[in-house]
A protein has these predicted regions:
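Hydrophobic alpha-helical connector segments
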Residues: 82, 96-127, 175-178
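Helix-turn-helix
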Residues: 33-36, 40-82
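Amphipathic alpha-helical packing segments from all-alpha helical-bundle domains
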Residues: 92, 122-130, 138-165, 173-176
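Solvent-exposed, amphipathic alpha-helical segments
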Residues: 36, 40-48, 94-98, 132, ...
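Hydrophobic/aromatic-rich alpha-helical bundle segments in the mid-to-C-terminal region
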Residues: 3, 143-147, 162-213
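An amphipathic alpha-helix signature
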Residues: 38, 111, 151-158, 162, ...
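Short, basic, alpha-helical segments at the C-terminal edge of helix-turn-helix-like DNA-binding modules
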Residues: 85-92
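N-terminal intrinsically disordered/low-complexity leader segments
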Residues: 1-32, 213
């Protein structure tokens, strides 16, 4: 069995519990909340790797004692689990809710989905995504979460095509192709010229929703 970062077999199951609601941004004179620790740990994950996420390093970074950390997490492992739960919620479940509300038709939702990676905050999210997946290549626990996230996303994309009138098997193939385009565009659009964004969106959407003659 592959090595786990948490060292607990039950950690993958704890990820299925509902995540706490994200706290609002704290004032400078207010105590740290759980989200502050998660954000700091994510910053280290992107800048270094998961091995760089150490309690003493986090405390130094945030200017607090270890007691503040242990107020929110029993162990470093609990923080790692919380990071993955937070990533799944913010970058998958919340995105699905946002896309669902963003358009009245499945085609409009697909277009908004394709446009996600060009939004201002997308580069930062792409860095987190890449770092999580790099971690998952070597460790079992995050790999299970990444696999679950991929299935959730693919299932949602597939349902968009089913709602647009495509058969289930065809919808699954189009969903996979859509996922490949979104993931690839999130990496490549900053270094390669794919043409005007609006033109790219319309041509890609037309290709993905085109029916055989």
């Amino acid at each position: 069995m592959a090595k786990t970062e948490t060292g607990k077999k039950g950690d993958a199951e704890t990820l299925k519990r509902p995540a706490k609601r994200s706290p609002t941004r704290r004032r400078k004179d207010s105590p740290l909340n759980e989200q502050d620790w998660i954000d700091a740990a994510m910053e280290i994950l992107v800048r270094e790797n998961v091995r760089g996420i150490r309690i003493d390093s986090l405390c130094s970074m945030l200017g607090v004692t270890k007691g503040s950390f242990y107020w929110h997490f029993k162990t470093r492992n609990d923080l790692l689990v919380a990071m993955l739960k937070n990533w799944r919620r913010r970058m998958t479940l919340n995105v699905i809710q946002s896309i669902t509300r963003s358009g009245r038709t499945s085609k409009a939702r697909l277009r908004n989905l394709l446009a996600l990676v060009r939004r201002p905050k997308s580069p930062a999210f792409a860095q987190i995504e890449s770092s999580i997946r790099d971690w998952a290549r070597r460790v079992e626990m995050p790999r299970e979460v990444v696999s679950e996230v991929d299935e959730i996303r693919l299932d949602y994309f597939q349902q968009l095509y089913i709602d647009a009138g495509f058969e289930k098997d065809d919808a699954r193939k189009r969903a996979y192709l859509t996922y490949c385009i979104v993931m690839g565009d999130s990496i490549l659009h900053r270094t390669l010229d794919g043409g005007p964004h609006e033109e790219f969106l319309e041509e890609t959407l037309d290709m993905l929703t085109r029916r055989g003659s």
